[in-house]
């Protein structure tokens, strides 16, 4: 059987050797060039392949059509991926008749995603493992072929667990590969309800929070111990790294982060003390704890983890226009969670952002973007990243007020885009899933799908074409004027503070809010055209995390990109959404305060929205760009989102007033 292998790291070397030992013919190996900035403590797949006389390649983009064609010419019977760091396109996955199989470093469906080795230690797990599974479009979601459990000892650190996993992987592959070679490939579906997903870990994630329980801090030390970057803290402006530690139950009443003793070196946490066994000051050498205390000049009672001294690097200033809106207020919360962001915002109200008004890094002005142009231009010039989030984005308004939609959504936003061009500022612009219109593709691709709208006499398309035209103008400014931009397209984001029940009362709200209002007031749930239209509903937390990563823009990977942000797995019809919502409503502890359910009522779209409306049968995103550019995968189930959204709205109702 002929195999093509994608491999990297020690696991890649183990996988290649196991495939050879099982008698497969390896036509080619694809790997990565080592990153000079990374500590390459692990084995080299390229050197192994070269020594074995096997062709080896390290393309920047293995999914490019040129490489897809070259792999097709190799005519593989089977494809293996052993710790290859990039997702493989569906075109590649479909090249092998026997299928494509990936080795993942956890017991799937738990710990899908990146860095499972480190995450299981961070979370204090007592068991992990390795899993061989079929590869599908979605990362780590295919059927399981085989798995092997690995116990995590209390003294395991990242490197010792890494060695255990490599050994388990070799045993697993030695056991299953001969069977697969004979064409017998048993597999069982993963249980989606048990799936968990974790993203990439960064060196800065090793910062210790001494207010956490001592076990949490100790587990962080274990999870990122050498050769990983390490858990670290500060003594004033001096950074130090902790390489090994142990838990001491008694903090002697000391405040978290304070030094209890220097020999041994012990630091108070929330519920105990951490004894630092070995550590390193700055870029120095590794020493035992008491010597580290001496090097840092620590004394009992000293307080660690103070902010580093001013380094001259100012915070990133983010301008959010429409900051009080659904996306704006949630994004503000995410940005303020990070110390290096400062948020400037404008909106016509502040009810959703009242919790931030006293925050020292949040600066708000109440105003209208169509009036306060001087303030906006000044702050575009002042800030680093601009997000013009102001738009009319409810379907009934497209037919009620098409000219107002055009004036606000296109004309006012175009002026802001031109300020960004003038002052050479990066813009992160909210396009919309509506731009795809009546596209017939099974899933909508940012770079390939056609944007199809209806006739001119259907004003519901005014929003879609206003956004599409701005997309094209922004793209042209990028090509001709060097504007730095990213366009993101949200697909039906839902969550708390989506809009308001008052907006639903006048028909100017999102679908789920209207449905909740019907339940609250005991009126029939109206299913427009039977509610058969399908959408992919996305939790606001998933959406905001993706948007935050666009703002971070690691390696400038988002520049000039269009990125869908949605959850393809949460596809449901409006009728299914209503049924799920009703089920959650009936189970809610406040259910007894509201009227009986009044049933469903089928309504024609023309009578509800007016003659200028057209609907769309389905709207499902491809999220390959988000996976590639953001290392992002949505993880929150639709039921969780519905329950949380419902809970927010029900608790916003004045129960006492209703009772009276």
From Swiss-Prot:
Tell me the segments the record calls region Formyltransferase ArnAFT: 1-304
Domain of life according to the entry: Bacteria
Q: Which residues bind UDP-alpha-D-glucuronate?
A: 393, 398, 432-433, 460, 492, 526-535, 613
Q: Give me the reactions it catalyses.
A: UDP-alpha-D-glucuronate + NAD(+) = UDP-beta-L-threo-pentopyranos-4-ulose + CO2 + NADH; UDP-4-amino-4-deoxy-beta-L-arabinose + (6R)-10-formyltetrahydrofolate = UDP-4-deoxy-4-formamido-beta-L-arabinose + (6S)-5,6,7,8-tetrahydrofolate + H(+)
Q: In which pathway does it act?
A: Nucleotide-sugar biosynthesis; UDP-4-deoxy-4-formamido-beta-L-arabinose biosynthesis; UDP-4-deoxy-4-formamido-beta-L-arabinose from UDP-alpha-D-glucuronate: step 1/3; Nucleotide-sugar biosynthesis; UDP-4-deoxy-4-formamido-beta-L-arabinose biosynthesis; UDP-4-deoxy-4-formamido-beta-L-arabinose from UDP-alpha-D-glucuronate: step 3/3; Bacterial outer membrane biogenesis; lipopolysaccharide biosynthesis
What are the residue positions of the site described as Raises pKa of active site His?
140
GO MF: carboxy-lyase activity; UDP-4-amino-4-deoxy-L-arabinose formyltransferase activity; UDP-glucuronate dehydrogenase activity
Q: Where is this site: Transition state stabilizer?
A: 102
InterPro entries from the entry? Arna-like_SDR_e (IPR045869), Bifun_polymyxin_resist_ArnA (IPR021168), Epimerase_deHydtase (IPR001509), Formyl_trans_C (IPR005793), Formyl_transf_N (IPR002376), Formyl_transf_N_sf (IPR036477), Formyl_transferase-like_C_sf (IPR011034), Lipid_A_modif_metabolic_enz (IPR050177)
Gene Ontology CC terms: membrane
Coiled coil ranges (UniProt) are none
EC number, UniProt record: 2.1.2.13, 1.1.1.305
Q: Name one GO biological process term.
A: lipopolysaccharide biosynthetic process
Keywords annotated in UniProt = Antibiotic resistance, Lipid A biosynthesis, Lipid biosynthesis, Lipid metabolism, Lipopolysaccharide biosynthesis, Multifunctional enzyme, NAD, Oxidoreductase, Transferase
Sorted alphabetically, which Pfam families does this protein's record hold? Epimerase, Formyl_trans_C, Formyl_trans_N
Annotated binding of NAD(+), by residue? 347, 368-369
- What residues sit in the active site? 104, 434, 619
Q: Where is this region: Dehydrogenase ArnADH?
A: 314-660
So where does (6R)-10-formyltetrahydrofolate get bound?
Answer: 114, 136-140
Its biological purpose is as follows:
Bifunctional enzyme that catalyzes the oxidative decarboxylation of UDP-glucuronic acid (UDP-GlcUA) to UDP-4-keto-arabinose (UDP-Ara4O) and the addition of a formyl group to UDP-4-amino-4-deoxy-L-arabinose (UDP-L-Ara4N) to form UDP-L-4-formamido-arabinose (UDP-L-Ara4FN). The modified arabinose is attached to lipid A and is required for resistance to polymyxin and cationic antimicrobial peptides.
**NCBIfam families (UniProt xref):** PRK06988.1, PRK08125.1, PRK11908.1
The record's similarity note reads: In the N-terminal section; belongs to the Fmt family. UDP-L-Ara4N formyltransferase subfamily.
Subunit and partners:
Homohexamer, formed by a dimer of trimers.
Q: What is this protein called?
A: Bifunctional polymyxin resistance protein ArnA
- Origin species, per record, is Salmonella paratyphi A (strain AKU_12601)
């Amino acid at each position: 059987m002929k195999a093509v292998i994608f491999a990297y790291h020690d696991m890649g070397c183990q996988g290649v050797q196991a495939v050879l030992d099982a008698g497969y013919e390896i036509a080619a190996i694809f790997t990565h060039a080592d990153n000079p900035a990374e500590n390459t403590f692990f084995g080299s797949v390229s050197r192994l392949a070269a020594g074995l006389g096997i062709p080896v390649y390290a393309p920047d983009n293995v999914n490019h059509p040129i490489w897809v064609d070259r792999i097709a010419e190799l005519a593989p019977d089977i494809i293996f991926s052993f710790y290859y760091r990039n997702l493989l396109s569906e075109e590649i996955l479909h090249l092998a008749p026997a299928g494509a199989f990936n080795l993942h470093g956890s017991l799937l469906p738990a710990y899908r995603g990146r860095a499972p080795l480190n995450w299981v230690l961070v979370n204090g797990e007592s068991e992990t493992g390795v899993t061989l599974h079929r590869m599908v479009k979605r990362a780590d979601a295919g059927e399981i072929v085989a798995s092997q459990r690995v116990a995590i000892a209390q003294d395991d650190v990242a490197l010792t667990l890494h060695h255990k996993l490599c050994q388990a992987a070799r045993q697993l592959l030695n056991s299953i590969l001969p069977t697969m070679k004979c064409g017998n490939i048993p597999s069982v579906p993963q249980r989606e309800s048990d799936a968990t997903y974790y993203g990439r870990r960064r060196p800065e994630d090793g910062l210790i929070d001494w207010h956490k329980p001592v076990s949490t801090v100790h587990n962080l030390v274990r999870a990122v111990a050498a050769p990983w970057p390490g858990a670290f803290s500060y003594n004033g402006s001096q950074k130090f790294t902790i390489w090994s530690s142990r838990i001491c139950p008694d903090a002697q009443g000391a405040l978290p982060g304070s030094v209890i003793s220097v020999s041994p070196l012990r630091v108070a946490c929330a519920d105990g003390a951490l004894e630092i066994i070995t550590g390193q000051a700055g870029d120095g050498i590794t020493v035992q704890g008491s010597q580290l205390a001496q090097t840092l000049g620590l004394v009992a009672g000293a307080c660690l983890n103070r902010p580093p001294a001013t380094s001259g690097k100012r915070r990133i200033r983010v301008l959010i226009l429409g900051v009080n809106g659904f996306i704006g207020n949630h994004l503000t919360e995410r940005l303020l969670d990070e110390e290096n962001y400062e948020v400037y915002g404008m909106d016509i109200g502040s009810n959703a952002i009242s919790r931030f008004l006293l925050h020292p890094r949040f600066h708000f002005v109440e105003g209208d973007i169509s009036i306060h142009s001087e303030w906006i231009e000044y702050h575009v010039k002042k800030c680093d990243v601009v997000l013009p989030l102001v738009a009319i984005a409810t379907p009934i308004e497209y037919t009620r007020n098409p000219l107002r939609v055009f004036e606000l959504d296109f004309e006012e936003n175009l002026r802001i885009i031109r300020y960004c061009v003038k002052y050479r500022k990066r813009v992160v612009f909210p396009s919309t899933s509506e731009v795809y219109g009546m596209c017939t593709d099974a899933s909508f691709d940012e770079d390939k799908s056609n944007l199809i709208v209806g006739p001119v006499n259907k004003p519901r398309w005014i929003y879609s074409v206003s956004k599409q035209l701005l997309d094209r103008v922004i793209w042209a400014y990028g090509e001709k004027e060097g504007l730095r931009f990213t366009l993101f397209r949200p697909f039906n984001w839902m969550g708390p503070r989506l809009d308001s029940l008052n907006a639903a009362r006048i028909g100017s709200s999102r679908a789920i809010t209207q449905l909740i209002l019907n339940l609250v007031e005991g009126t029939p749930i109206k299913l427009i055209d039977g509610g058969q239209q399908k959408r992919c509903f996305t939790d606001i937390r998933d959406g905001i995390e993706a948007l935050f990563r666009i703002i971070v823009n690691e390696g400038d990977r988002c520049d000039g990109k269009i990125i869908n942000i949605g959850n393809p797995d949460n596809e449901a019809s409006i009728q299914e959404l209503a049924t799920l919502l009703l089920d959650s409503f009936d189970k809610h502890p406040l259910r007894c305060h509201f009227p009986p359910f009044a049933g469903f009522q089928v309504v024609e779209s023309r009578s509800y929205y007016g003659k200028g409306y057209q609907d769309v049968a389905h709207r499902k995103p491809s999220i390959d760009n988000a996976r590639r550019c953001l290392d992002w995968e949505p993880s929150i189930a639709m039921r969780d989102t519905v329950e949380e959204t419902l809970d927010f709205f029900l608790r916003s109702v004045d129960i006492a007033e209703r009772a009276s």
